[in-house]
From Swiss-Prot:
Pfam families: PsbT (PF01405). Keywords: Chloroplast, Formylation, Membrane, Photosynthesis, Photosystem II, Plastid, Thylakoid, Transmembrane, Transmembrane helix. GO terms for cellular component: chloroplast thylakoid membrane; photosystem II reaction center. The keyword Ribosomal protein does not apply. The chain crosses the membrane at residues 3-23. The gene is psbT. Found at the monomer-monomer interface of the photosystem II (PS II) dimer, plays a role in assembly and dimerization of PSII. PSII is a light-driven water plastoquinone oxidoreductase, using light energy to abstract electrons from H(2)O, generating a proton gradient subsequently used for ATP formation. Belongs to the PsbT family. One of its GO terms (biological process) is photosynthesis. PSII is composed of 1 copy each of membrane proteins PsbA, PsbB, PsbC, PsbD, PsbE, PsbF, PsbH, PsbI, PsbJ, PsbK, PsbL, PsbM, PsbT, PsbY, PsbZ, Psb30/Ycf12, at least 3 peripheral proteins of the oxygen-evolving complex and a large number of cofactors. It forms dimeric complexes. The modification N-formylmethionine is found at M1. This is Photosystem II reaction center protein T. Its main location: plastid. It is found in: Plastid, Chloroplast thylakoid membrane.
């Protein structure tokens, strides 16, 4: 059970970071273009 919680936490953190970068980059590129 502990391993599952740790895995979920790791995936959640990675997902949030990837989502933030993916959402923050397009607007910049669009504005620059």
């Amino acid at each position: 059970m502990e391993a599952l919680v740790y895995t979920f936490l790791l995936v959640s953190t990675l997902g949030i970071i990837f989502f933030a970068i993916f959402f923050r980059e397009p607007p910049k590129i669009s504005t620059k273009k």
